[in-house]
Amino acid sequence: MKFEEVIGIDVSKLTLDAFIHSHQIFTQVPNTKKGYSKLLTWATKSTGCLMDKVLFCFEHTGMYSYALACHMTEKQMNYIMVPGLEIKRSLGIQRGKNDRVDAMRIAQYAYRRREEVTTYRLPEKAINKIRQLLSLREKLVKQCAGYEASLKDLPDFIESSESKVLVGVQRNMIKALAREIEKVEKEIDSVLESSPDIMNNYRLITSITGVGRQTALYLIIVTNNFLSFDDHRKLASYAGVAPFANTSGTSIKGRTKVSPLANRKLKSLLSACAVSAIRHDPEMKLYFNRRTEMGKHKMNSINAVRNKLLARVFAVVRRGSPYVPLCQYAA
């Protein structure tokens, strides 16, 4: 779509600072529902063009930008949400910053890419709820692990006669947290059952040896149920498991390696899946052993397994049928 105007929005907790690129006009509104309506009214009057010809751009700032994205979707506006790091690196060397300048820089970024961008598609409510539940579960699991580690170390530093209360309270906390984690798991199952498309992809992904429940759920929310990524290589790059060359002319001949710019949570989950697949999937075990026997580094081979697992995930989702181990048909 050809856009006639671009508006950059700097999102903060309390306010939205907006800048119209070609008119060089600035405004500030509250980060509330009334503020969103005021922003769209201002944009309509100030640009003088139809709203379907206007592209809005703002940074992805979590819950502060989510409500704005919901309002934009409801009003059928064209908008993109972009990571702040991408905008920052695209503008070259910059000095100084404030909300107005940030809005102008966001507008400049969007204007340069207005002909190549794909407007943002807000995930369905079920995916957003799974994301919130997984985040809560992660916090509860970390707390539980903290108490378990404390209990394990307690006997080394305190006499058993003096630690009765300390042990009792922490054991009760572990039991309470375990119950809350179970509640969260049941709620996730309820959300899955309410959305057939998500449940279908969840079952397909977990049919792959080595890919467990948490990884399958995280892949679904990261890919917007496989609508935001159409290729496993793009997701591999996003997860930080895609190898990139590191050479330049005759002076730099570095090793091919993965980028530190990555979704570290997804990368960690894929690493655990790769280790599990090597242990339990004969085909992956053979593939891993063959690479190491060729002299490949262990982590290099594990990374290759991570990429193969992502390829399998996209294959089963695209095909719409569970993974079938080929080794069981081998002669």
Functional labels for PLM-detected ranges:
Residues 207, 213, 217-298:
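Phosphate-backbone recognition surface of nucleic-acid-processing proteins
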Residues 79-204:
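Long, charge-rich intrinsically disordered scaffolds of nucleic-acid metabolism proteins
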Residues 52-64:
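Short glycine-rich phosphate-binding loop at a beta-alpha junction
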Residues 118-132, 159-162, 254-257, 286-303:
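Short, solvent-exposed helix-loop connector elements
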Residues 250-254, 288-331:
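Low-complexity, acidic/Ser/Thr- and charged residue-rich accessory regions of DNA metabolism proteins
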Residues 23-50, 55:
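Nucleic-acid-processing active sites and adjacent nucleic-acid-binding tracks
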Residues 1-21, 106:
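Gly/Thr-rich phosphate-binding beta-strand-loop-beta motif of the actin/hexokinase/Hsp70
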Residues 13, 62, 86:
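Short, glycine/acidic-enriched loop or turn micro-motifs at the edges of active sites
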